Design a protein with these regions (language model features):
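Glycine-rich phosphate-binding P-loop
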Residues: 37-55
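Residue-level signal for functionally critical sites in structured catalytic/ligand-binding pockets
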Residues: 44, 143, 355-356, 369-371
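Extended hydrophobic secondary-structure segments that form protein cores and membrane-embedded regions
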Residues: 36-41, 136-139, 291-295, 349-356, ...
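Canonical P-loop GTPase G-domain recognition
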Residues: 52, 343, 357-429, 438, ...
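N-terminal pre-Walker A segment at the start of P-loop NTPase domains
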Residues: 2-31
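Switch- and interface-adjacent substructures of P-loop NTPase systems
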Residues: 21-25, 31, 43, 58-346, ...
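Intrinsically disordered, low-complexity boundary segments flanking structured domains
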Residues: 37, 42, 105-108, 377-382
Length: 486
């Protein structure tokens, strides 16, 4: 039975690979190189604004504006391409860009659709060189869906094992759910189990945890945001109330009683349906990603303390691990599975970016430094280095890179969250010591609030005095395209 499932899984991978080849041939015939950029990160990390800023930087790039792509100039070849052929929503770039440019800037609405893509067919021209055509695709995914990627490459049993390993590191948070499972043999109903798991998810939600799986309890399959706390009783842990699942102990698989076997069968079927409808379409796109940008919400981490800080790091490790070759399939299954895994990961560059840094204001704290040290630590860097064979860039966001000393001559880091996000006057600068953790190729600023409108979208003919935020965005844009415009 296991061999048959491996054959089916391997055949599915080959079919997806065949579709990849066909799309690649189409781009070759069009003589256009495609670059797919995917921005990942937990909920509210700034993915939509980041994508809008990046696209604006590309579309408004012209020689002499203080932004040099190795003397190449970018031009839109044939207007913004739509994505209707692949049944994926179009990223509303023009709407967001116009909203940012207003006298009273409008913040983009929360991303709710399953996925949206912005296609930029660009021509790059340089004196004395043949012009180059690039189709740049940028994928936007709701932050809620990122947690579902923990199901990728996992059967229901494998996912349960993974979830309970995570549970083991935070027993106090999920103790009631584990206690219910321990006592389930005495009085078990599926409804009671689902209610116990939803109660656990609600506790995680209130702690700003990114680990809300399945994500449909917060964002329905159709992209409608839910009132999770008020609608707990009616929210389904799956595609519908008839197709629900929750993690169960691995012991249930190894020596199950009759009621446990029936439960596992139903849960596994609901899990597979959910993966096919929600997770697999995202994974199919991610398999063809060339550039990966992972955003970390510094605002959420600093205001929430060490628990959220540790969760964010583990969340980043889990997501980035999906792209690492160290995590690929091995030839222990069907031969087709192994062959497809050899071409599965194509990411050449990965970037780790800290967002919302401008909301930190003056007051001595070492939280930011600790965060940077951890995010640039050996474990996470090891995952990033396993992603691709090209340049792996791990970068942190700062407003100003400088060294400041206290009266004793010791270096200090200033970081505190302003409780008033609507504050519009300039925040005090946050200074980070020059002795930045090794491994950061360069430092960049991606800012939030009013700073997005003032710094990320300046008048493109008046950029001589670009802000650190704009300079950072320029650096990232150049890095993303450096191998194509060498």
């Amino acid at each position: 039975m296991k061999f048959v499932s491996n054959v089916i899984r391997g055949t599915g991978n080959l079919l997806r690979f065949d579709c990849t080849i066909k799309r690649g041939v189409e781009h070759i015939l069009q003589r256009r190189r495609r670059i797919r950029i995917v921005v990942l990160g937990s909920k509210n990390s700034g993915k939509t604004v980041f994508l809008t800023a990046l696209a604006s930087n590309l579309l408004n790039h012209r020689k002499g504006n203080g932004f040099d792509l190795n003397q190449w100039e970018a031009f839109v070849e044939e207007g913004l391409a739509d994505s209707h052929k692949e049944d994926i929503a179009d990223f509303p770039y023009s709407q967001y860009r116009e909203g940012f440019a207003k006298e009273n800037p409008e913040w983009p609405e929360k991303t709710t659709c399953a996925m949206s893509v912005l296609r930029l067919p660009l021509v790059f021209r340089k004196e004395g060189c043949k012009e180059r055509s690039l189709l740049i695709e940028m994928l936007d995914i709701p932050g809620e869906r990122i947690a579902d990627l923990t199901m990728a490459k996992k059967s229901y049993r494998e996912w349960c094992r993974w979830m309970f390993e995570k549970f083991g590191s935070q027993y106090s948070a999920n103790g009631p759910y584990l206690e219910y499972l321990d006592n389930a043999k005495y009085c078990f109903t599926k409804d009671d189990l689902f209610n116990a798991y939803k109660t656990y998810l609600l506790a995680e939600y209130r702690k700003y945890s990114p680990w809300i799986v399945p994500s449909v309890v917060k964002l329905t399959k159709d992209g409608k945001a839910t009132q999770f706390e008020q609608e707990l009783d009616i929210r389904a842990l799956g595609l519908s109330l008839k197709d629900q699942f929750a993690p169960v102990p691995i012991e249930w698989f190894e020596s199950p009683e009759e009621w446990q076997t029936a439960c596992i069968k139903d849960f596994a079927a609901a899990y597979d349906k959910y993966k096919e409808a929600i997770v697999d379409p995202i994974c199919d796109w991610l398999r063809e990603t060339d550039r990966l940008v992972y955003l970390v919400d510094i605002l959420n981490i600093l205001k929430s303390g060490s628990a959220v800080y540790n969760q964010e790091r583990k969340f980043a490790e889990a997501v980035l691990g999906l792209f690492s070759r160290h995590k690929s399939y091995t030839p222990c299954g069907a031969i087709w599975d192994y062959l497809s895994s050899m071409v599965k990961t194509r990411i050449k560059d990965a970037y780790l970016v800290v967002t919302k840094k401008d909301l930190a204001v003056s007051e001595t704290s070492d939280n930011l430094r600790k965060l940077a040290d951890a995010l640039l630590g050996k474990e996470l860097r090891g995952l990033m280095n396993g992603i691709g064979e090209g340049n792996i860039r791990i970068c942190a966001a700062v407003d100003t890179v400088s060294s400041r000393h206290n009266e004793s001559g010791q270096e200090v880091t200033y970081a505190k969250i302003s409780p008033d996000k609507t504050k519009t006057e300039p925040y005090e600068q946050v200074y980070v010591p020059d002795t930045w953790p090794s491994g950061a190729d360069w430092k960049m600023a991606i800012e939030d609030g009013k700073f997005w409108f003032e710094d990320t979208y300046p008048q493109f003919d008046e950029r001589e005095n670009a802000s650190p935020a704009q300079s950072g965005l320029d650096d990232l844009t150049k890095a993303l395209l450096s191998s194509e415009l060498a």
